[in-house]
């Protein structure tokens, strides 16, 4: 029995050693960012991927999202927890299934941590804002009101 426990522990340790972090060292200067339209949020929003592949499971993803002035990302959820840091501009972070766009706009440097599957929304005031979003892939967004989903709209 002791041998069985020993070998079980040994296999578990070997498995965890093989599953060690595969993230590579990376330095991404701001002028190296490649901004692209982000089809997952309303028209005008852009994204730049700094690290990782948001389509891959288990991968650490760091991305910046550029939000125009007077902009709303309607209430939505993600299948993952996310950590958002406001880089520039001012934004409001709201919780719930209905947006009211009320409350004080956060200042650069503010951190917003949101658990998986918690409805939230983001809005800007009269200036553009950039947020940095970190999560473990794969990425995903589900709008509370399907009519708000820009991927389902035809222009």
PLM features: residue spans?
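Conserved short histidine dyad/triad with adjacent acidic residue
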Residues: 51, 61-78, 106-107, 115-117
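Positively charged n-region of N-terminal signal peptides that target proteins for export
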Residues: 1-4
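Short beta-strand His + acidic residue motifs that chelate non-heme Fe in jelly-roll/DSBH
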Residues: 73-75, 93-94, 114, 119-125
């Amino acid at each position: 029995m002791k041998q069985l426990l020993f070998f079980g522990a040994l296999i578990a340790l070997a498995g965890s050693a093989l599953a060690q972090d595969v993230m590579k060292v990376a330095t991404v200067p701001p002028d190296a960012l490649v901004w692209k339209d982000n089809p997952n949020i309303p028209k005008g929003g852009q994204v730049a991927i700094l690290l990782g592949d948001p389509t891959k499971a288990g991968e650490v993803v760091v991305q910046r999202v550029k939000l125009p002035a007077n902009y709303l990302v309607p209430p939505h959820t993600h299948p993952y927890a996310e950590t958002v840091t406001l880089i520039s501009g001012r934004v409001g972070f709201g919780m719930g299934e209905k947006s009211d766009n009320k409350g004080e706009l956060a200042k650069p440097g503010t951190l917003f941590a949101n658990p998986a599957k918690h409805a939230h929304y983001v809005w800007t005031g009269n200036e553009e804002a950039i947020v940095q979003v970190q999560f473990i892939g794969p990425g995903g967004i589900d709008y509370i009101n399907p009519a708000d989903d820009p991927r389902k709209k035809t222009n």
